[in-house]
Amino acid sequence: MKFQSIAAVILGLLGSGCSTLVSKVFPLDDLPVPSGPHAVGTQYFEWVDGARQEPFTEDPKDKRRLAGQIWYPAGVSDDSLRQPYLDYPERRLDMISYQSGLPRFMVAHMQRVQTNSMLNAPLLPHSQKRPLVLFSHGLSGMKNQNTIQAELLASHGITVISVDHAYDAYLTIFADGTVADYRSSDTENRTGDAFWAFRLPQLKTRVADLVFVLDE
């Protein structure tokens, strides 16, 4: 009975359409400040692998296109360069709402969450040979989902590269406005050999994505 009462209160808040109340009940703060001694810089990138056909589309002329993000130890700290957690928030919030099954106004305050990453901040001097971590998100994930960990590593002198595996990510948005939607969900009704016949090519595509990024 107590759970039903709590649920009724939550539903009442949802029904009110009051985003301010929702942000209080379901708070989302700025990302925690990383513990390392260095500031954190970030850059976005887009690459096209001209040697690979895009396996998720039917047009044989489509080449594999990737969007990603890099975090690295920066030489300066400037709060005016801090990036929001969500790029293209208006488009991403629609998809987050759809995937989570929550009304859009319940997730709208995600667009106000700030990271500690400074866009195009200069690289920390003498950091060209620091360790590198390559991050690969899960099915329907996104390149920046583990920004907290990426910033933590970068603040300790480690460079992190993450890529949206196009069509495996929940939504990839390119700088020209085109998108790659999620197309990897057709595994639920497959078992045994049928499952792996469908999934293995996708996994090979992911591995090829990472190899391509490292080569770049």
Annotate each language-model stretch with its function:
Residues 21-133:
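Domain-level recognition of soluble alpha/beta enzyme cores
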Residues 16-17:
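C-terminal motif of bacterial Sec signal peptides marking the signal peptidase cleavage site
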Residues 1-6:
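Bacterial N-terminal signal peptides that target proteins for export
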Residues 81-83, 172-176:
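Short aromatic-enriched loop/helix-cap "lid" or pocket-rim segments at secondary-structure transitions
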Residues 70, 153, 210:
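Divalent metal-coordination and catalytic microenvironments
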Residues 116, 122-130, 135, 139-173:
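Short substrate-entry loop that stabilizes the transition state in hydrolases
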Residues 178-216:
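Alpha/beta-hydrolase active-site loop
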